[in-house]
Structures are given as structure tokens and as C-alpha cells.
């Protein structure tokens, strides 16, 4: 069906019930740096492999992880500008909820409102779908919450999730973890290890690891991981990779 005209508009279904423009938007995510979220017993950890296109970039700029509300973080994969639009919308929703109800927005409600907003952009010929998937991590009165929203507007709740070019390999690694027994501090190291292990050195040379957490240790506020902890996690990740490489060489 591709190339027969059914892929010209996001308002057109193909004969087999597919909307190609939405599928193409998902391809933008599949070609982007990996992002993942881990929901553990005391909070949520978000990690992103931010691919660096130039050595001239200032460190810690063009972030892929943002704070949507004081207790909620958002990690994105795909087109960064589209992701920023969702961050702005998320912040507006969180602010209006607090003004109206006098309390913080729950992860479930924020996820519903954002996914409805994303889905609207697949209904009209005058707009295009968002070329980004986002992972929402919150801690509210119901405990840690983790959601992922796709360009189609579909969203699910997760214990662990990955998006981007290394998503499949990352999911395999996430499934090996005992997330319900893990603390956020431990999860930071594992998240760093997974991002380093799925990074493709052959295709993408340089990348910057972004890590954030919202947990009991941060007072249930979304914050970027402190520099010393980030460096410790990166060291752990590199050591673990070297050990795995040594073991595979010995087996050969």
C-alpha cells in the first residue's frame, strides 16, 4: 500500500486499516537515541542516550529529559522540537490542574491528558502527528508511576520501558532486572549500564548520558541525578561492559 496515495494524509486509512503518516512518525522515534524509564520500589528513574551531532555543543544543553511538574519528569525520543511542544503542554496541564483542584496532578491524569492531545494530531489534514514518543515518570499519592505515550496517542503504564533505536535490546536487559526489589539509587547504575550497552559505537560515536530521578531520596521531586552519582553510574556501566567483553573473548 505504501506509495499508492494512502500515505499522503494522516486522515486517510489504507484498505487494510493502517494510517501510514502515524507509522512514519513512529519511524522518527526508531531512528533516535534510546530513552528508558524504570519504576522501582521507591521511585522512578529516567535515562537518555543523547547522541551528539557535533563536538562544538555545550555540555548539558538540548536536554532530552525535562521537568513537567515538580513531581513529574518526561524523557523523549524522536524529534526534539516536537518533544518540547509536549513538555510545554504537560506543564500547562499540570498548572491548570493545580489552579483548579489545589493539588498536584496525578501521573494517571497527566498521562491521559497528554495522550489525548497527541492523538488529536492524527485526526486532521491540517496538522501532522508528533514525531516523538515520551516516557512520563511521576511519584504521586498512589506511589511511583511510569507511562509511555506513542505518536498515535496510545499510552500504557509500565514497570520498565524503552524507546528509540536501542529499544529492543534495552527491553531485553530491563526484563532481567528485579525492579520491585530495587531502589532508585541502584536503578540509576542499571539504567546507565543499559544505555551504554545498547549504544552503537559503529554508527554513533559520541553521546551524553542524561539521568534523572523522582523518589523518596529527592523528597518525591523530579531532579537530575547529581554529578558525583552520574559519574559513579557511568564508571559502573563502563566496567560492566568491559567485564562482559573480556568474558566473551575468553569464551572465543
Swiss-Prot record:
Keywords: Cytoplasm, Nucleus, Proteasome. One of its GO terms (cellular component) is nucleus. GO terms for biological process: proteasomal protein catabolic process; ubiquitin-dependent protein catabolic process. Gene3D superfamilies: Glutamine Phosphoribosylpyrophosphate, subunit 1, domain 1. CDD domains: proteasome_alpha_type_3. SMART domains: Proteasome_A_N. It is found in: Cytoplasm; Nucleus. Belongs to the peptidase T1A family. The 26S proteasome consists of a 20S proteasome core and two 19S regulatory subunits. The 20S proteasome core is composed of 28 subunits that are arranged in four stacked rings, resulting in a barrel-shaped structure. The two end rings are each formed by seven alpha subunits, and the two central rings are each formed by seven beta subunits. The catalytic chamber with the active sites is on the inside of the barrel. The proteasome is a multicatalytic proteinase complex which is characterized by its ability to cleave peptides with Arg, Phe, Tyr, Leu, and Glu adjacent to the leaving group at neutral or slightly basic pH. The proteasome has an ATP-dependent proteolytic activity. This is Proteasome subunit alpha type-3. It comes from Acanthamoeba castellanii (Amoeba).
